[in-house]
């Protein structure tokens, strides 16, 4: 009781001091950004969240995996993409380190120097890595080589101190290593066919990952291989590499209403969650491997899904403005799709008090691309 009385007296004196001393007291009223405020229609450069790039580095060959002749060094593709997407306020880079040349071997000092140069460039650009290690660049049995379980264990043990030294530039580590693009399918040695092998690899990836950094997994099924009471389970989040909204054979069984979808909804609020749309060729029905027709991906429903599953980052290079485009892709349509306060309130999605108006009170139109850009990992 004495403590309560003392607190009330101090509070009263403090209030009296501020109300009696007119000089030096400033009152500020804060509000949301109006559409016609300076930079009111531009994206915020939010650290560790928002849109991300994707860069794949062949660690042994020291070049960009998908166009080594055009980008024969370690960082030129990263620099080009950073400039190309600068207007989209990108602070993250999904960083693929392909260890193909280290299959059957130990990682060398030169391998670590190569990865270190890439990390240093990220630092200088003010960006962080959504980090994934992989070995295989082909699927459907086309890979020419791939790691064994022993290769992966050896490399994770070598990588552990290196990642600890560079944790300042790592936002999250994705559980790659297995199969095509590190997506846990189509591996050369069939590693994904054994639950014991997948569990062992996931545990070693968790040990490799610096303390304070989450691990993201492709589908909840793989996370569920672990004991739910284990520390490893408690630090694992998700990355969805095939966001198409409607059900598709390649969606990993994660379309809305499935147990996997609902697990992500439940477990994602306190974790970074990453994702991407398929490439534009899928939407344009130009992917010869696609087992069924593609489509333009709905922007409003994508925003709703990102909200429900608490996404932190989304690839801005998929289905948007890829080089040498001859078509208009999904995200370009998003820029033409208005988003309304009614839609947001109906779906219990956040909206700032000034987002849809100008300073004079008139209504400002916003599109779903801008809404996702401005809220991803921050308010959704």
Pin down the residues of each PLM region.
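C-terminal motif of bacterial Sec signal peptides marking the signal peptidase cleavage site
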Residues: 17-20
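Boundary/entry segment of secreted carbohydrate-active catalytic domains
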Residues: 25-91, 96
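Hydrophobic faces of well-ordered beta-strands that scaffold small-molecule active sites
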Residues: 49-55, 93-95, 129-133, 171, ...
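Aromatic-lined substrate-binding rim segments of carbohydrate-active enzymes
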Residues: 77-136, 213
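An active-site-proximal structural segment forming one wall of the substrate-binding cleft
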Residues: 110-128, 145-172, 196-208
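Active-site groove signature of glycoside hydrolases
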Residues: 130-140, 159-192
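Aromatic-lined carbohydrate-recognition surfaces of secreted/lumenal glycan-active proteins
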Residues: 170-181, 202, 209-227
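Substrate-binding cleft of secreted/luminal carbohydrate-active enzymes
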Residues: 219-224, 231-369
């Amino acid at each position: 009781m004495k403590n309560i009385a003392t607190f009330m007296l101090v509070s009263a004196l403090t209030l009296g001091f501020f109300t009696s001393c007119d000089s030096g007291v400033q009152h500020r009223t804060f509000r949301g950004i109006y559409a016609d405020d300076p930079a009111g229609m531009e994206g915020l450069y939010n650290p560790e969240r928002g849109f991300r790039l994707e860069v794949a580095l062949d660690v042994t060959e020291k070049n960009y995996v998908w166009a080594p002749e055009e980008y024969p060094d370690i960082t030129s593709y990263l620099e080009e993409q950073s400039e190309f997407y600068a207007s989209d306020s990108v602070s993250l880079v999904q960083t693929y380190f392909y260890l193909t040349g280290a299959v059957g071997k130990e990682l060398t000092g030169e391998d670590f120097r190569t990865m270190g140069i890439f990390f240093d460039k990220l630092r200088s650009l003010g960006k962080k890595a959504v980090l994934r290690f992989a070995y295989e660049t082909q699927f459907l049995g086309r890979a020419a080589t791939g790691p064994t379980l022993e290769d992966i264990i050896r490399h994770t043990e070598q990588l552990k101190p290196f990642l600890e030294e560079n944790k300042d530039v790592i936002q999250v580590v994705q559980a790659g290593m297995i199969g095509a693009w590190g997506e846990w399918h189509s591996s050369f040695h069939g590693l994904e066919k054994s639950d014991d092998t997948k569990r062992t690899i996931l545990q070693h990836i968790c040990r490799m990952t610096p303390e304070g950094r989450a691990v993201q997994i492709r589908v909840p099924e793989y996370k569920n291989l672990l004991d739910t009471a284990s520390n490893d389970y408690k630090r694992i989040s998700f990355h969805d590499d095939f966001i198409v909204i409607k059900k598709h054979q390649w969606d990993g069984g994660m379309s809305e209403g499935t147990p996997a979808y609902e697990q992500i909804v439940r477990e994602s609020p306190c974790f970074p969650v990453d994702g991407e749309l398929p490439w534009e060729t899928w939407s344009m029905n130009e992917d010869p491997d696609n087992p069924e027709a593609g489509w333009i991906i709905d922007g409003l429903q994508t925003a709703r899904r990102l909200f429900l599953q608490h996404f932190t980052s989304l690839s801005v290079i998929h289905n948007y403005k890829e080089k040498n485009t001859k078509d208009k892709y999904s995200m370009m349509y998003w820029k033409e799709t208005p988003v309304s306060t009614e839609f947001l309130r109906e779906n219990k999605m956040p909206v700032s008090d000034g987002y849809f108006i100008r300073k004079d009170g008139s209504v400002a139109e916003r599109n779903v691309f801008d809404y996702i850009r401005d809220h991803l990992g921050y308010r959704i």
